[in-house]
Structure formats: structure tokens, C-alpha cells
Amino acid sequence: HARIFLKKILTGYSENYMELRSPCGAGIGQMAYYYDGNIYTCDEGRMVAEMGDQMFHLGNVNYSTYDDLMENRVCKVTCQASVLESLPGCCDCVYHPYCGVCPVISYASDNSIYARESNVYRCKIYKGILDILFEILFEEPDAEDILKTWI
């Protein structure tokens, strides 16, 4: 993740990593197709289905059109739930331009597609990585040139 964050910080461009977007890529930047033809918002959504919960099921290749998938309520709600500017704790976070949330992981861990505020494990990890990167960039004169070689 550090390399992805660095690219956003130093160039303003993103790798388009689905979980570090706002909104996330579930359903709009990626979909997961299962062997039985079922289509899910993402691979994480497919894994939730493997556990018996069809929460992130969008349709089936045998009867769903692309428009059906895009108009599916699950696709829309998953997208809406990952817009950082609308999430408490994310909307006013200094790091939100670099970050993203995964509604599927939020659902799997908390039974809600809406991420909890800053006590979320992934949030703590991302903030820790970003804290260290910015600290290095501000305190080490040659750091930017060295870190640019990572991207």
C-alpha cells in the first residue's frame, strides 16, 4: 500500500486500486464472476456469498444484462457506502484524498456496509502508513527523490 499512497502523494495520480478509491470499485470498477454464473460486486462480495450470505449478489450471466447490473440496488448502495466525503470520520480526515473504504469488509466485520469511524483496523493501518510517509517526506531532505524510485 505504501507505493500506492506514494504515487498519489507525489504525482497526484492513482493506481486505481479498487479499495483505495472513493467510491470503491465494487460493481463499477470490478465485478466477480463465479463458476455458476453468479455475478458479485467484487471478489470480496463473492467470498461473503461463499459463507452463505448473498448480500453482494448482482445477477447472473445467464439472465442479467450490463444495465441490470448497473441498476441493481446492491451496486448503487455499495457505491454510495464507499464515498468518503459522506462517511463520518472519513469526510474530515486529512488523509481522505489518499484513502478508501471497502463496504464488503465493513459488512463482514461489523454487519454494516458503512465503515465505523477511526477505530477500524484498516483505517488505523492506513493512517499509520501515511503518518510515516509524510513524516519521512517532511523530515528527510533527500527522501522524495529516493521514494520516487518506488513509483
Show which residues each predicted segment covers.
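A C-terminal junction/extension of Radical SAM enzymes
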Residues: H1-M47, E85-S86, L147-I151
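C-terminal accessory region of radical SAM enzymes
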Residues: H1-Y13, G45-C91
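Generic structural signal for secondary-structure transition and capping sites
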Residues: G29, C42, V74-C75, Y98
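Radical SAM enzyme core and accessory elements
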Residues: D36, M47-E50, F56, V61, ...
